[in-house]
From Swiss-Prot:
Pfam families given in the database record: Gag_p17, Gag_p24, Gag_p24_C, IN_DBD_C, Integrase_Zn, RNase_H, rve, RVP
This protein's name: Gag-Pol polyprotein
Domain notes: The p66 RT is structured in five subdomains: finger, palm, thumb, connection and RNase H. Within the palm subdomain, the 'primer grip' region is thought to be involved in the positioning of the primer terminus for accommodating the incoming nucleotide. The RNase H domain stabilizes the association of RT with primer-template. The tryptophan repeat motif is involved in RT p66/p51 dimerization.
Residues under site feature: Cis/trans isomerization of proline peptide bond: G244, P245
Feature type site, description Cleavage: Y155, P156, L389, A390, N463, F464, L515, P516, F614, P615, F1054, Y1055, L1174, F1175
Protein role: Gag-Pol polyprotein and Gag polyprotein may regulate their own translation, by the binding genomic RNA in the 5'-UTR. At low concentration, Gag-Pol and Gag would promote translation, whereas at high concentration, the polyproteins encapsidate genomic RNA and then shut off translation.
Regulation: The viral protease is inhibited by many synthetic protease inhibitors (PIs), such as amprenavir, atazanavir, indinavir, loprinavir, nelfinavir, ritonavir and saquinavir. RT can be inhibited either by nucleoside RT inhibitors (NRTIs) or by non nucleoside RT inhibitors (NNRTIs). NRTIs act as chain terminators, whereas NNRTIs inhibit DNA polymerization by binding a small hydrophobic pocket near the RT active site and inducing an allosteric change in this region.
GO (cellular component) term, any one: membrane
Transmembrane segments: none
Residue ranges with Polar residues bias: 113-125, 135-151
Position of sequence motif Nuclear localization signal: 26-32
Length: 1462
């Protein structure tokens, strides 16, 4: 500081301090402005020593002047300061900054004109650069014009003594400064002026060197390269190459690539830059620099995307910090200067917090930034809060506050507040609307603030702080200092009883002194003696130093500035001062200065031995209960061996000592058996409890985590740590009311003593509720830590924790230490034994490395004799390995254990299974690794066909780096084809990807677009088709045959049919052709469906290459329309083989027994002596009904008594309903009072749809707009018509609005939200939206307006289409559900009433009364009773119903004395 401040001395310093910062302003230049200017020059890699003389100042001015127009406010302020300093050195008399800047700009203009008029030869003879010679004539360093006084050459092109221009490589210091700028600033707006300053006079070669120095920013450099290429191409278009020879003495004109330094040499660049333009000179360095700045502007917009509209002052943010952020962002805004000026004038005030906004508005229009900063200094931050607090304290204790410099105001009443700003009573300075009072709030004088005021509090000043603190004199409780004690467990070494500052003393017991133990329900104030002076002080563990006010200490002191509550505070630092607290005295460093309250900091607290004691935070107990009507388990303990009894006794002693179990007496009637097993590879025992009976009786729980996290979903992190929570379940408390049900007994040897009984106080191992409760508790414990560190990955599964971050090693370890301490405060220990901080990390069965992951080592079993259990374990390990090992198969191995077999039953390995196992072993020999997920790259999934119905797939982002692999061998049905299998596999991969990454990958499928489209058109029951593309990876999927949609005119038509007798199982299949041919075949032990298939087989066998087949069997149509290429049925397999040999096939259906030509003939042919033929009526009426209402086939079959095949054919013949047939899935049943609601769009209008989940009943209407108000109206209408207890919607803004919340609250409706586009959520209403639109399309031509068509479609869906459970319409099903629900509730009430009665009864042959039995139902003529496990029906005349009043003594009364009911 001294070196920089010494640039001016004597008269020059006086002149400097007499110059005003602004014209007509009061503030003047001080030495601190020189210090600031020197620091700024060093930031821009310029030598601060240049400020010592006029020549150096002029060089700085020339360097900064090009950046003034586009530079930041800091650059402009630095330029102005150097201009003033130049004038002081040059002896120019100026009054303020503006005059100095005008003088400098005038000299710059003169020098520029002289430079233009002077010839190149004259400049060389002078041997100097005119640019670097100050106009004042005080020249220096004439031989090397670009050399700084310190001797370093910052500018690349220099002129030697002979006047020859040569290149000086750019200095390492300049490159280092540029790299530091990028590392510290990134690509924010400050980079551009810094680059401009560092690259002044540089050649393209040097500019490329600067870009190469930051080449690790690949994305930014690529964008910069694109901008440079565009500008180079534009240069080439504007400056085409000249044809013909080059003129003598002229340089060639550079191309765009030459300017960028790609195709030009360094010598050419120097010549272009130093040669006059008349001789072909081109400033290639400046041009290239301009191109780079254009690219940097683009990078600033990309890397600093924050809009100026988003910059708002926080409630506690200092105004100066807010202004810094505001101007930093506005520099990055791509707008004209008038627009930026308007933004500054408007948004700077508009986005300030309320405290500052009141003050800024009071300043009026046109206030300068300096006035704003002055007025808002100390407002809004912690210092302002401290002032308000002190103001309130002063108002409460002092009689009044005198803010006026003149007369006194009347004393304030108790509880009144007085403003520090305006002096009025009734409000505080924070809420004062008067203009911010300038000057000091203590002495009233202007020119300084209160923190800099040297005047002490007196009668004429402001009584800002109280002389006596309100808590002085309040004596804290004195307790004996806590004796050091060992804590059982893993040494979580802090005491656990109190929360506060505990101050024990050291020394022997006889010298132990008493110090207070302070709880934090009040401020920890104590009486302190500082060098014999008594005062009150606050114990502050957050303060580094101890600070006192209004005390006078003896001894030497040094000045110091510290950051205090009110900003920076000047203090005096005294060393080795005696400080006494209680009866203990220490010597420490003490600071004396202006502080609101005396503070004892850590430097003294540490010497006193004070500690902060945190109690273990109580974990919230989850309430648990048994299932309704059940009692706890009462299972007797089975016998145990002597060594097991001894082992269990020792284990339970330890658990009881740790408080995890507690002893119970005989009053607890419940018991669960226990036993012990030895741990693997050790002689220690492990206690196990058989909670099977308790699990049956305990309420059900919902697993919060549906699966384990997968490493493929992890992001690549610099630092990773894996932790394990020790004794996880034993760290979570069990519901005290439920503990009695966990009681168990340790028996004694030979029953020499009663068994020892215990019950669990924590979650027991093996109990069904432990996993769910532990997951829930662990999540609540980790939530605050997750919110505090959002950039850190924390994966939690049961007691395993994965923590990944991009911090450096030291910061990451601090983070892990903080997490472990956080868990420890809740009583959760993370033992060092399972603490992993170095790779490889063993986690969840995986092995994690910094750049890859794999599964842990897999060892396949190789027993001498294979059993079912061995095969099961083998398949499980292979399935686990298949997630990263590509090509694993298990189909043949799974065939070995088909059926119901015992675990120990031997299995003979088939040749195919042995071959499959050997292939898998070869795959596992080579180590395979997986990659980590990168959110910036797209996700792809490649699928390969392995044959025999087995498939394999890989999910990856980069070729050769698989995230995950897998296999698939699920067959969707008996008759299938490869495309149906492919659709199932795509569905599986899609679900996996949504779970792991939250997105669906792009699929690479081994099927051509024509094949897929052909099958998709005919077989439409694919619920979801992803984005995909064809890859030519054999073997490809293909359709081996295709069914035509139109008959083949030249081909023979075969009418086929089959018949079978249900009783004799005899049948016949045959066909009749349109050319007079016919044939039949008798069948044994067959069915109607098999006979129909045999008829098709006969027709295919006897037909040519092209054939038309007509059948009346819907079963045959269903099998063959799916285009199967494989089947488990022999007859279907034969048909498939024959179909593949045909060139063209047409398959059609006609209704049976309707007198249709060929069908009637073949029906008679195959039915003779086999079955009777029936004829139907009502088909025409059903056809008319469907044309009007488009009912589904079940409604037609019910209403008109038609067979399903006929009703389905009526649907198939309708052009509007045969678009995509009937879905193959059925109705899903849910709770009776749940509705799903969604909004869909049609014809540019909004349709809101509500679906009753259990019945499929729809309420829908067209609403004017998709808002919360309209949605709330619809929900209230729905609740007024039907019982609605719960609605399920997506997260749309209309459903999350306040209006919908209010409507649900008023109607007592529980509102749940789903996930948009997730197949596991909103499925019912999404499906109904689709169906409703199809119905609207069918009836749209019958209605003029869409709202009418919607109502018609709702009516058709609810009352004209049957199906699902009960074969009802949706309306009938809803009424049935509601009626049944009401009847069930009434019945339950009656059952509860009769449960309090007991029944005595007699059998028919036994006159002895039996009972009491439990009454289940009382009817008119009989009663239903339960005795033991038997349920009986007894006539009323043989039963007596007794109300149970409790146990009665034997002999106290007979049957006649008891109350009965007959």
């Amino acid at each position: 500081m001294g070196a920089r401040a010494s640039v001016l001395r004597g008269d020059k310093l006086d002149t400097w301090e007499s110059i005003r910062l602004k014209s007509r302003g009061r503030k003047k230049y001080l030495i601190k402005h020189l210090v600031w200017a020197g620091s700024e020059l060093q930031r821009f890699a310029m030598n601060p020593g240049l400020m010592e003389n006029v020549e150096g100042c002029w060089k700085i001015i020339l360097q900064l002047q090009p950046s003034v127009d586009i530079g930041s406010p800091e650059i402009i302020s630095l330029f102005n300061t150097i201009c003033v300093l130049y004038c002081v050195h040059a002896g120019e008399r100026v009054q303020d900054t503006e005059e100095a800047v005008k003088i400098v700009k005038m000299k710059l203009t003169v020098q520029k004109n002289n430079s233009t008029a002077t010839s190149s030869g004259q400049r060389q003879n002078a041997g100097e650069k005119e640019e670097t010679v100050p106009p004042s004539g005080n020249t220096g360093n004439t031989g090397r014009a670009t050399e700084t006084p310190s001797g370093s050459r910052l500018y690349p092109v220099i002129t030697d003594a002979q006047g020859v221009a040569r290149h000086q490589p750019i200095s390492p210091r300049t490159l280092n400064a540029w790299v530091r700028v990028i590392e510290e600033k990134g690509f924010n707006p400050e980079v551009i002026p810094m680059f401009s300053a560092l690259s002044e006079g540089a050649t393209p070669y040097d500019l490329n060197s600067m870009l190469n120095a930051v080449g690790e920013h690949q994305a930014a450099m690529q964008m910069l390269k694109e901008v440079i290429n565009e500008e180079a191409a534009e240069w080439d278009r504007a400056h085409p190459a000249h044809a013909g020879p080059q003129q003598a003495g002229m340089l060639r004109e550079p191309t765009g690539a030459d300017i960028a330094g790609t195709t030009s040499t360094l010598q050419e660049q120097v010549l272009w830059m130093t040669t006059p333009q008349a001789q072909g000179g081109v400033p290639v360095g400046d041009i290239y620099k301009r191109w780079i700045i254009l690219g940097l502007n683009k990078l600033v917009r990309m890397y600093s995307p924050v809009s100026i509209l988003d910059i708002k002052q926080g409630p506690k943010e200092p105004f100066r910090d807010y202004v810094d952020r505001f101007y930093k962002t506005i520099r990055a805004e791509q707008a004209s200067q008038p627009v930026k000026t308007w933004m500054t004038e408007t948004l700077l005030v508009q986005n300030a917090n309320p405290d500052c906004k009141h003050i800024l508005k009071a300043l009026g229009q046109g206030a300068t930034l300096e006035e704003m900063l002055t007025a808002c200094q100390g407002v809004g931050g912690p210092s302002h809060k401290a002032k308000i607090l002190a103001e309130a304290m002063a108002s409460a204790t002092a009689g009044g506050v005198n803010m006026l410099q003149g007369g006194k105001r009347p004393p304030l009443k108790k509880g009144q507040l007085q403003c520090f700003n305006c002096g009025k009573v009734g409000h505080t300075a924070r809420n004062c609307r008067a203009p911010r009072k300038k000057g000091c709030w203590r002495c009233g004088q202007e020119g300084h603030q209160m923190k800099d005021c040297t005047t002490r509090n007196n009668s004429t000043g402001v009584n800002f702080f109280r002389e006596t603190h309100p808590l002085v004199g309040v004596q804290t409780r004195e307790l004996c200092a806590e004796h050091p004690r060992e804590r059982e467990g893993s040494g979580a070494g802090d005491s656990t009883d109190t929360s506060g500052a505990n101050c024990p003393t050291t020394g022997d017991d006889d010298e132990r002194r008493v110090l207070p133990q302070v709880n934090l329900w009040q401020r920890p104030m104590m009486t302190v003696k500082v060098q014999g002076q008594v005062c009150q002080a606050l114990l502050d563990t957050g303060a580094d130093d101890s600070v006192f006010c209004n005390i006078k200490l003896k001894g030497q002191w040094t000045p110091k500035t510290i950051g205090g509550i009110g900003g920076f505070v000047p203090v005096s630092e005294y060393y080795n001062i005696p400080v006494q607290i209680g009866n203990k005295e220490v010597r420490a460093t003490v600071l004396v200065g202006e502080t609101p309250i005396n503070i004892i900091g850590r430097n003294i607290l540490k010497q006193l031995g004070c500690t902060l004691n945190f109690p273990i935070s109580p974990i919230e107990v989850v309430k648990v209960q048994l299932k309704e009507g059940m009692d706890g388990p009462k299972v007797k303990q089975w016998p145990l061996s002597k060594e097991k009894i001894e082992a269990l006794t020792e284990i339970c002693k330890t658990l009881e000592k740790e408080g995890k179990i507690s002893a119970v007496g005989p009053e607890n009637p419940y018991n669960t058996p226990i036993f012990a097993i030895k741990k693997k590879d050790t002689s220690k025992w492990r206690k196990l409890v058989d909670f099977r009976e308790l699990n049956k009786r305990t309420q059900d729980f919902w697993e919060l985590q549906l699966g384990i996290p997968h490493p493929a979903g992890l992001r690549k992190r610099n630092m990773v740590t894996v932790l394990d929570v020790g004794d996880a379940y034993f760290s979570i408390p069990l519901d005290p009311d439920f503990r009695k049900y966990t009681a168990f007994t340790i028996p004694s040897l030979n029953n020499n003593t009663p068994g020892k009984r215990f019950q669990y106080n924590v979650l027991p191992q093996g109990w069904k509720g432990s996993p769910a409760i532990f997951q829930s508790s662990m999540t609540k414990i980790l939530d605050p830590f997750r919110k505090e560190h959002p950039d850190v990955d924390i994966y939690q599964y049961m007691d395993d924790l994965y923590i990944g971050s991009d911090l450096n090693e030291e910061e990451h370890r601090k983070l892990i230490k903080k997490l472990r301490q956080h868990l420890l405060t809740w009583g959760l220990e993370t033992p060092d034994k399972k603490y992993q901080e170095k790779p490889p990390f063993m986690w969840m069965g995986y092995e994690l490395h910094p750049n890859k992951w794999t599964v842990q080592n897999i060892t396949l079993p190789e027993p001498e004799q294979w059993t079912v259990n061995h095969i099961q374990k083998l398949v499980g390990k292979l399935n686990w390995a298949s997630q990263i090992y590509h090509g694993i198969k298990t189909k043949e191995l799974c065939k070995l254990i088909r059926g119901v077999k015992g675990l120990t039953e031997p299995v003979e390995m088939t040749r195919e299974a042995e071959l499959e196992l050997e292939e898998n072993k070869q795959i596992l020999k080579e180590k395979v690794q997986g990659a980590y997920y990168d959110p910036k790259l797209p996700l792809q999934a490649a699928i390969q066909k392995q044959g025999q119905g087995q498939w394999t797939y890989q999910i990856y982002q980069e070729e050769g780096k698989n995230l995950k692999t897998g296999k698939y061998a699920k067959s969707p049905g008996t008759h299938t084809n490869e495309i149906r299998q492919l659709a199932g596999l795509i569905q599986k991969i899609g679900n996996e990807s949504i779970i792991i990454w939250g997105i669906v990958p792009k699929f690479l499928l081994p099927v051509s677009k024509e094949t897929w489209s052909q099958w998709w058109t005919d077989y439409w029951q694919v619920t979801w088709v992803p984005e995909w593309e064809f890859i030519n990876t054999p073997p490809l999927i293909r359709l081996w045959y295709n069914l035509l949609s139109d008959p083949i005119p030249e081909a023979e038509t075969f009418y086929v049919d089959g018949a079978a007798n249900r009783d004799s199982k005899k049948g016949r299949a045959g066909y009749v052709t349109n050319r007079g041919r016919y044939r039949s075949k008798d069948l044994e032990n067959t069915t109607n469906q098999q006979a129909e298939l045999w008829a098709v087989d006969l027709a295919l066998k006897d037909s040519g290459a092209q054939v038309n087949i007509v059948t009346d069997s819907q079963y045959v149509m269903g099998v063959l329309q799916g285009l199967p290429d494989q089947s488990d049925s022999p007859i279907v397999e034969q048909i498939i083989q024959k179909l593949t040999q045909k060139t063209a096939i047409y398959l059609a259906w006609v209704p049976a027994h309707k007198g249709i030509g060929g069908n009637e003939e073949v029906d008679k042919l195959v039915s003779k002596n086999i079955r009777k033929i029936l004829f139907l009526d009502g088909i025409n009426e059903a056809q008319e009904d469907h044309d009007k209402y488009h009912s589904n086939w079940k409604a037609l079959a019910d209403e008109y008594n038609l067979p399903p095949v006929v009703a389905k054919e009526i649907i198939a013949q309708c052009p509007k309903c045969h678009i995509k047939g009937e879905a193959i899935h059925g109705q899903v049943d849910y709770s009776p009072e749940i509705w799903q609601i969604d909004c869909t769009h049609l014809e540019g209008k909004v349709i809101i749809v509500a679906v009753h989940v259990a019945s499929g009943f729809i309420e829908a209407e067209v609403i004017p707009e998709e808002t919360g108000r309209e949605t709330a109206y619809f929900i209230l209408k729905l609740a007024g018509r039907w019982p609605v207890k719960k609605i399920h919607t997506d997260n749309g803004p209309n459903f999350t609005s306040t209006a919908v919340k209010a409507a649900c609250w008023w109607a007592q409706i529980q509102h749940e939200f789903g996930i948009p586009y997730n197949p596991q959520s909103q499925g019912v209403v999404e499906s109904m939206n689709k169906q409703l639109k199809q119905i609207i399309e069918q009836v749209r031509d019958q209605a003029e307006q869409l709202r009418t068509a919607v109502i018609m479609a709702v009516y058709i869906h609810n009352f004209k289409r049957k199906g699902g459970i009960g074969e009802y319409t949706a309306g009938e099903r809803l009424l049935d559900i509601l009626t049944t629900n009401i009847q069930t509730k009434q019945l339950q009430k009656q059952i509860l009433k009769v449960q309090n009665f007991r029944v005595y009864y007699r059998d028919a042959r036994d006159p002895i009364w039996k009972g009491p039995a439990r009454l289940l139902w009382k009817g008119e003529g009989a009663v239903v009773i339960k005795e033991g496990e038997d349920i009986k029906v007894v006539p009323r005349r043989k039963a007596k119903i007794i109300k149970e009043y409790g146990k009665q003594m034997a002999g106290a009364g007979g049957m006649d004395d008891r109350q009965n009911e007959t």
